Curated annotation (Swiss-Prot):
Homohexamer. PROSITE patterns: SM. Belongs to the Hfq family. Residues 10-70 form the Sm domain. It comes from Clostridium botulinum (strain Alaska E43 / Type E3). CDD domains: Hfq (cd01716). RNA chaperone that binds small regulatory RNA (sRNAs) and mRNAs to facilitate mRNA translational regulation in response to envelope stress, environmental stress and changes in metabolite concentrations. Also binds with high specificity to tRNAs. The gene is hfq. InterPro entries: Hfq (IPR005001), LSM_dom_sf (IPR010920), Sm (IPR047575). GO terms for biological process: regulation of DNA-templated transcription; regulation of RNA stability; regulation of translation, ncRNA-mediated. This is RNA-binding protein Hfq. GO terms for molecular function: RNA binding. GO terms for cellular component: cytosol.
Length: 77
């Protein structure tokens, strides 16, 4: 049986969401958003910024910078 492997993007966003790590999201327009990742799917990210939710399309994101490092741990070892 094949195990579904999460991609790096999903691991990164899920860790930021679970640990409520504040992130800065840079958009392709140069605009900068700060907040907490509340959820995500294949095409979008929900960011909570100052109590307001924003639906951001991933194709508009250039960079996501966490406030503190996100550790990547292989849970299968």
């Amino acid at each position: 049986m094949n195990k579904q492997q999460n991609n790096l993007q999903d691991i990164f966003l899920n860790s930021a969401r679970k640990n409520k790590i504040p992130v800065t999201v840079y958009l392709s327009t140069g605009f900068k958003l700060n907040g907490i990742v509340k959820g995500f799917d294949s095409f979008t990210v929900i960011l909570d910024s100052e109590g307001k939710q924003m639906l951001i399309y991933k194709h508009a994101i250039t960079t996501v910078t966490p406030e503190k490092p996100i550790l990547f741990v292989d849970n299968e070892s």
